[in-house]
């Protein structure tokens, strides 16, 4: 049995006026699925630095008031995901950012009340974030 590659990432539950930002993946194997924005931790970064950088890259926004929520461990078919999640707020507005010349990082974004989370088709690992957030 092969050992799954482990990928360590960070994700943001961005809260504004009581609603939470969900983003729709705009590329790759999970295109069209909904997720909390974030990405991989680079060597030499701590989790908070990585999350601030990723949100700046993906949404051209700055975040603050980071509060740790949960760490999710999830086995996808080709890799093991460790996702450290923080609740945070925005310092400025967000905008769409292109992943490459032709692909948007995110196809769509929506602000949701936590009662509306169940209406979206989420990436499986993000469902554990939703559960943790609803318990807060």
List PLM regions with ranges:
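A conserved beta-turn-beta hairpin within the catalytic core of GNAT-like acetyltransferases
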Residues: 29-33
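Conserved hydrophobic "DFG−1" position in protein kinase catalytic cores
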Residues: 14-15, 22, 88, 111
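The catalytic Nudix box helix
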Residues: 36-70
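Conserved N-terminal beta-strand and adjoining loop/helix that marks the start
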Residues: 1-20, 40, 71
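Beta-strand scaffold of nucleotide-dependent catalytic cores
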Residues: 22-24, 100
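Active-site-adjacent beta-strand/loop module that shapes the phosphate/pyrophosphate-binding cleft
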Residues: 4, 72-97, 110-116, 133
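NUDIX/MutT-family hydrolases
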Residues: 99-132
């Amino acid at each position: 049995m092969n050992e799954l590659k482990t990928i360590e990432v960070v994700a943001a539950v961005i809260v504004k006026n009581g609603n939470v930002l969900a983003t729709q993946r705009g590329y790759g194997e999970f295109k069209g699925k909904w997720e909390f924005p974030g990405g991989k931790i680079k060597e030499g970064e701590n989790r908070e630095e990585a999350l601030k950088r990723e949100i700046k890259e993906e949404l051209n926004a700055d975040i603050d008031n980071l509060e740790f929520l949960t760490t999710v461990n999830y086995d996808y078919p080709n890799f093991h995901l460790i996702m450290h999640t923080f609740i945070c707020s925005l310092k400025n507005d967000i905008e769409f950012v292109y992943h490459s010349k032709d692909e948007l990082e995110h196809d769509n974004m929506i602000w949701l009340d936590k009662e509306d989370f169940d209406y979206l088709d989420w990436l499986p690992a993000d469902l554990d974030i939703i559960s943790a957030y609803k318990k807060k």
